[in-house]
């Protein structure tokens, strides 16, 4: 990963919360920055002793000014997302063997704040609620195609919370072939039809 990331220093007492795994950094938690960061930019967090705490996406328009993505120095690209999706998928397969429709990625629960990925048989639907994830949408779609190999990838981003990140509502096909309806099997015995258009 490049070492030229903008550095944000958090106030004394805030570091312990981040070290414990809390994924959000509020504006009131930030003491200073090495330079003014750009909205959507990947930044690094340090404590007042210059101890590295992790990296995350910055957005000045949100009360959550940084959404952490890792406590290590990483490069956020399609390979990064593929690795996280594989890890999340492994957990689901372990707890739901044989399931073909389920939530693959559950935002903070899978260390991907602002991203939800649902799998409906061979169709994948993603929902993005943060600017940083929105700017990496192409990387996310590429990772989804690599790991899940779906027939189609859709976005359903009409959620109200996007406005707090300065994002407009949007939905539609991102990759693959158009699909209007999907027959979904839940709990192996229950069938459900999901409308995508």
Where are these regions (language model features)?
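Short amphipathic alpha-helical segments
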Residues: 77-84, 132, 136-140
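Surface loops and adjacent helix of pleckstrin homology
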Residues: 57, 129, 158
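Structural motif
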Residues: 42-43, 123-125, 151-153
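Non-catalytic substrate-recognition/targeting regions of SAM-dependent transferases
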Residues: 107-118, 136-190, 194
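Non-catalytic accessory regions of SAM-dependent methyltransferases
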Residues: 1-121, 178-181
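A short interface-forming secondary-structure element
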Residues: 121-134
């Amino acid at each position: 990963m490049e070492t030229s990331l903008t550095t944000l220093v958090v106030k004394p007492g805030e570091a312990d919360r981040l070290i414990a795994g809390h994924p959000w950094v509020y504006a009131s938690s930030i003491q200073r920055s090495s330079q003014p960061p750009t909205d959507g930019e990947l930044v690094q967090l340090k404590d007042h002793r210059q101890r590295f705490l992790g990296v995350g996406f910055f957005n000045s328009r949100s009360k959550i000014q940084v959404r952490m993505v890792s406590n290590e120095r990483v490069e956020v690209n399609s390979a990064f997302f593929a690795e996280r999706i594989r890890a999340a998928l492994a957990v689901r397969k372990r707890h739901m063997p044989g399931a073909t429709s389920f939530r693959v990625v559950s935002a903070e629960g899978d260390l991907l704040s602002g991203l939800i990925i649902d799998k409906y048989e061979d169709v994948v639907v993603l929902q993005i609620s943060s600017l940083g994830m929105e700017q990496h949408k192409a990387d996310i779609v590429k990772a989804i195609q690599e790991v899940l190999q779906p027939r189609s990838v859709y976005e359903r981003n009409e959620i109200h919370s996007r406005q707090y990140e300065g994002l407009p509502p949007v939905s539609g096909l991102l990759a693959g072939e158009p699909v209007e309806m999907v027959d979904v099997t839940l709990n192996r015995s229950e069938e459900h039809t999901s409308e995508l258009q």
